[in-house]
Amino acid sequence: MNKIFKVIWNPATGSYTVASETAKSRGKKSGRSKLLISALVAGGLLSSFGASADNYTGQPTDYGDGSAGDGWVAIGKGAKANTFMNTSGASTALGYDAIAEGEYSSAIGSKTLATGGASMAFGVSAKAMGDRSVALGASSVANGDRSMAFGRYAKTNGFTSLAIGDSSLADGEKTIALGNTAKAYEIMSIALGDNANASKEYAMALGASSKAGGADSLAFGRKSTANSTGSLAIGADSSSSNDNAIAIGNKTQALGVNSMALGNASQASGESSIALGNTSEASEQNAIALGQGSIASKVNSIALGSNSLSSGENAIALGEGSAAGGSNSLAFGSQSRANGNDSVAIGVGAAAATDNSVAIGAGSTTDASNTVSVGNSATKRKIVNMAAGAISNTSTDAINGSQLYTISDSVAKRLGGGATVGSDGTVTAVSYALRSGTYNNVGDALSGIDNNTLQWNKTAGAFSANHGANATNKITNVAKGTVSATSTDVVNGSQLYDLQQDALLWNGTAFSAAHGTEATSKITNVTAGNLTAGSTDAVNGSQLKTTNDNVTTNTTNIATNTTNITNLTDAVNGLGDDSLLWNKAAGAFSAAHGTEATSKITNVTAGNLTAGSTDAVNGSQLKTTNDNVTTNTTNIATNTTNITNLTDAVNGLGDDSLLWNKTAGAFSAAHGTDATSKITNVTAGNLTAGSTDAVNGSQLKTTNDNVTTNTTNIATNTTNITNLTDAVNGLGDDSLLWNKTAGAFSAAHGTDATSKITNVKAGDLTAGSTDAVNGSQLKTTNDNVSTNTTNITNLTDAVNGLGDDSLLWNKTAGAFSAAHGTDATSKITNVKAGDLTAGSTDAVNGSQLKTTNDNVSTNTTNITNLTDSVGDLKDDSLLWNKAAGAFSAAHGTEATSKITNLLAGKISSNSTDAINGSQLYGVADSFTSYLGGGADISDTGVLSGPTYTIGGTDYTNVGDALAAINTSFSTSLGDALLWDATAGKFSAKHGINNAPSVITDVANGAVSSTSSDAINGSQLYGVSDYIADALGGNAVVNTDGSITTPTYAIAGGSYNNVGDALEAIDTTLDDALLWDTTANGGNGAFSAAHGKDKTASVITNVANGAVSATSNDAINGSQLYSTNKYIADALGGDAEVNADGTITAPTYTIANTDYNNVGEALDALDNNALLWDEDAGAYNASHDGNASKITNVAAGDLSTTSTDAVNGSQLNATNILVTQNSQMINQLAGNTSETYIEENGAGINYVRTNDSGLAFNDASASGIGATAVGYNAVASHASSVAIGQDSISEVDTGIALGSSSVSSRVIVKGTRNTSVSEEGVVIGYDTTDGELLGALSIGDDGKYRQIINVADGSEAHDAVTVRQLQNAIGAVATTPTKYYHANSTAEDSLAVGEDSLAMGAKTIVNGNAGIGIGLNTLVLADAINGIAIGSNARANHADSIAMGNGSQTTRGAQTNYTAYNMDAPQNSVGEFSVGSEDGQRQITNVAAGSADTDAVNVGQLKVTDAQVSQNTQSITNLNTQVTNLDTRVTNIENGIGDIVTTGSTKYFKTNTDGADANAQGKDSVAIGSGSIAAADNSVALGTGSVADEENTISVGSSTNQRRITNVAAGVNATDAVNVSQLKSSEAGGVRYDTKADGSIDYSNITLGGGNSGTTRISNVSAGVNNNDAVNYAQLKQSVQETKQYTDQRMVEMDNKLSKTESKLSGGIASAMAMTGLPQAYTPGASMASIGGGTYNGESAVALGVSMVSANGRWVYKLQGSTNSQGEYSAALGAGIQW
């Protein structure tokens, strides 16, 4: 390519200049300080002083004044470069009176002064006094070490301080002042912006006239003010004037300590108050106003919602337009109102206007204090699902429908009389049908009962039968009462009559048993009288019968003594003869009697039949034995003949018995003279190893049969056995034999005590295997043992020491203990995350607990935020009272309060609805109507009690009335004679002890067999008197009706009853309770045996015996019953005392199993109870040695102090959250294996840090909202970010990215125009159009890094690449250039490619070193070195040129392509296009080319054409000659037609055996085998040649061509030309290029023959048409015009770039601010967040709202941002996580 010029930067003129292509260029420097320094240095060097600085290595060059030193330079009048401390300091002074006194210092400029070591002073009167300080600007001063002062009168006094801007001041250490008159006074304070002021330590003022007057304060925005410690003001005119106050937004004010105002014109003036929202206001301590126009004006007040108002202390207004005006009030809902103190309004439009009132529900209102309303006068609501309230005299609980129903139902049931409960809860009318009438209420019924009952007479102390005017009255229809010693039943007349008719009456001398017409009669039902020596009781027939029976029995037994019966004395004297007496001689009792040596002993009780028993046996026992003997008789039929004589049988038994033969030591079957005999009828004996049974013949027969069978089988084996015996005998020596001593098989052999056992098959290796194992198995085991031994040996020391370092089981604690050494507690680290499931027993690690704690902390924060609201809500809500187990309507200081507007609840047995007053009134009204007695209910619900008159006394309630009747029924149901349903009779029990009582005024009842009348005392007295008279013995009737004991004197004895008297008469002792010396094991006892058979009998009337440890009294049945009853009651479990005194088994149900005794129940309880384990110090839930569940556990309280057990559902709920958190943790944590951590570093998914070999230094994010990621990363300021090892972000919102990066600079906010002056070039900026955040630093002072692989920026605030910057700078100049102009209003040109040039509107050059000139010209990125000149020209290929409107390159450089008429492959370096495929243009005024690669003009081509014409004529002539030749050849052909193909003539030879030639066309010639001349006048020469066109000669075919060689150069126009002629012709011509297929490419012409050199086209006329070539003059003029236009556009572009840069920076700041917004992360949580960002001098503020779905899967985010450029942006996103 012919590159004739290039554009380079001229530092002298400060502009880009067109220069020769060989000129060298450094390009324009981009840095400000470098640009300024370059300008200053260049200005100094080019001054009129004419000084020069050569490169000396020896003595310095002195062009000014100063003392000598090594390496110093002083240039300028009065300049001094003097090092006081070191003569080799190499200081430099340039300029008038410039002084560089510091070591290695530089003073450049008039009267500059640099006294600090390595200091630099640039500018008139600039002073750099501190070491390594820099002062840049007229009169700038850098006093502090390492400080920098940039700008006119800029000044730095502090260490490493920085002041940039006119009159800026950085006074304190590490301070930054950036902006005109910006001032930063205290340590690390920052002032950015014109007149910005940061006067306290760590303060930051960002923005014009911003002020940060408090320590750690931040003022961000124009005229923002943060005057107190820790205060923050963000926004124009924002103000935070108290400690820790925060004001964010335009004109916001945070005036109170710890207050916060966020939103336009919001104000938080109270301490710790918060105002969020446009014009929101929080004016008192702890007040919170959130929402547009919200106001919280009292202490602790909260207003949440647009235009909400909280004007009462501790009040909360929540909802749009809500208002809480009362103290401690709560308004919850849109337009809700809570104006009463302690009032609550919940719901849209709800209003609680009165004190301590509660309005719940939309539109609910209260009109009275201390009430709860769930509706209003027009709208009522039910309270449903309400638990039953407590019912007591102190209860204030609300009662639900089911309770009211239960009460009504119980009243109806107690009232009886058909009363029921109506659907409205009232009790229906009662109806009592009494004898005196039907009554419809209790009072009337009681009155009716009172007049007709048997009343108690207190005076008489008895029931009185008087009624009306009659003093005495009968009691009729009295059932027969029980007559017994303890009976207190009334007896009726018939009983008394029967008694009189059947009584044993006294006839004057004795009781007469005469009855009716019978002179004598029986006395029946006589209780057995006492039979004692002094008894006078009458004896009954049974007693006498017993006596008589005994007498009869005795008579039989002592028949021999009947003669002695007549004389009792003789009988007594002869008693010894009839007694069973001891016979000393015989040593036994003797039954001899009289002359009989033997006699019977009768009535003998059955004796014990045991081995040790000495009891006599009676006949029945012997009878049983005899019966058994008789039964056995049939079994010994062979001895029947011997039965008649037992003695003989017994004597002969020895001969017939199977007797033991001592000699033989066995039973012998010998019998008589036979030595042997059969034993028949032998039962088959057991055939077992241990059986000793005899076997019978059948068994032996079976055995013999088997033996016979075996004998046959054995016979065949006998020989073998014989042989085997020998073998076995010999085998003993070679066998593995059992060693009894060793108890094992022995491998001993011969004289060897041990020997091998070979060929042993591998035995089974199982727990129960007894197989022998072989050597290979043992080898494997030994190898394993050896391996294990080695491992164990290696582990021994570790194991020995492991005890101290292991997590061991602590038996006492029942758990693993982490105690270590002397420390009772220690950490357990590297614990893998445990499973968090309901049944998990895994240990959890700190991260899991940390996550849980973080979640808890988050929840705690959320809960804390709600605590006050909930607390207030609890005060005003209908809340659950745990102690009472119910909802409580207590409110404020009132223990009780109303619940109003309550809809009527459902009344049923299972209703839990609350009941309102009208329902209770209805029930009470119905109840009072049924109570009667004047009971009533007032309109206020007050019940007036009934009045019942009972017995002349008034009673005001049913209970007292019933009690009165009960005192008269027992006082009339207490004094009434009532029916005892249990006893089935009327009971006269009375009083609190139910003692029997007297019934007085009883008229004489009828006495007859059918009478059921009650008998009065006089009637009974008459009977008793009669009986007493009949008894005699001085018996009389006592005052209580009893009869005194009679006295009978009989046989010298005194008896007090008839029985005793009769007993005295009785001469026998058979009925007495006698001593039995044989009883009680021979120790003797009284025997109650009675009667002939001496059967056991009852002893009645036994008095209660003493019950004590020493008592030996007899105990009666009642005592035993009482004891058993007590035991049964104590046992419980439905145990009862049976009629026989036994106790039924109790039933205890434990764990759904019944147990019938205490022991089993206790065992079951002990096995199934949750018992205390002393060792574990806890309840042990193990069962059968295994851990077991505890079910049905109520949910325990969850609090920090709770010790309640928690149930599975609670833990499951926690586990679900933990699981969700665990999943989130696992997703974050990633691979936590040690190997992975060692290889990849510790961290979480996608975030890793490898701290191997580094001391532990955690990241620190101490700033509010700060983030630090990386080893020892530090983010110490608010919202700062530090990422990378040792990275530090120490400025608010600053970003330090990369290891060792430091972000400590606050970006300047302000404006400045770009200017060029004698002091140099000042690059302008405008940072006021957006919020400025902290700088992004990717390095540190002296430590830099590149940002590589940055994509080209496309938006205003995008980062730009070096390529873009170079192209932008290289494409334009900052000042106009002469002879270069452009006139257009279209978009500017853009030179993107490196070293590229773009001239013209809309022209874009993307290719490196490309040139684009013209309107909308394009050079593609791939078209390196491409040139497009002309409107819409396109250079699409590298090293190619498109020239002219619409011209395009279409192929570019080609390699090895086939050129037209060229045999050798050709190469090209590019393409020159002056048109396009559908639009070509001429190249005119082309000079005649001379070189091989020159273009040729039409004139040259005409010469060639003339030559071609001449050649054509020569060819025509040749054709004529050929035609003539054809004729001759034809003649020859005809002449030689008969010549064979292989024949020849003298001058014509062929050598072929192919096909014949074929001349088909007229006058055609075909010569050669297979040649064809098909067309007229055609010639085909050569084998296979084809001539198929007229007038042509073919030397080949379409598929087989031939050259015609040795062609002489043609002369005539029709002569053939040879290649050399054609080359000569083409050498001087310009040809079109050829396409890849060899065709001519009329769109391309290659000059210079395609060689690497270039060709000039001279004398080119100025192009006129769009497709004409342009000459150099035209191009030069175009370039000049383009340059002029470009310079103009460059100025405009510079401004646009500046603005674009600002907008891009603002956009980046917005993106960073939105990126920095935190988001909610716990399920169901929401978050409102604020963030800030700054980039390249621009800043932004972002607000966001985020929420997480309840299941934690979905996350939604909405965020918006505004920046200092006044632009707004928003983003919306949603995501799902798994």
UniProtKB/Swiss-Prot annotation:
A matching Pfam family: YadA_stalk
GO BP of this protein: protein transport
Transmembrane segments: 1724-1734, 1738-1748, 1757-1763, 1767-1778
Protein purpose: Mediates aggregation, biofilm formation and adhesion to a range of extracellular matrix (ECM) proteins, such as fibronectin, fibrinogen, laminin and collagen types I, II, III, and V. Mediates adhesion to human T24 bladder epithelial cells.
Record note on domains: The signal peptide, cleaved at the inner membrane, guides the autotransporter protein to the periplasmic space. Then, insertion of the C-terminal translocator domain in the outer membrane forms a hydrophilic pore for the translocation of the passenger domain to the bacterial cell surface.
The organism's place on the tree of life at top rank: Bacteria
Keywords: Cell outer membrane, Membrane, Protein transport, Signal, Transmembrane, Transmembrane beta strand, Transport
Cellular localization per UniProt: Cell surface; Cell outer membrane
Assigned protein family: Belongs to the autotransporter-2 (AT-2) (TC 1.B.40) family.
Main location: other
Region (Translocator domain): 1690-1778
UniProt xrefs under InterPro entries: Adhesin_Head_dom, Coiled_stalk_dom, ESPR, Pilin-like, Serralysin-like_metalloprot_C, YadA_C
Region (Surface exposed passenger domain): 54-1689
Name used for this protein in its record: Autotransporter adhesin UpaG
An annotated GO cellular component: cell outer membrane
Induction: Expression is negatively regulated by H-NS.
Signal peptide feature range: 1-53
Subunit structure: Homotrimer.
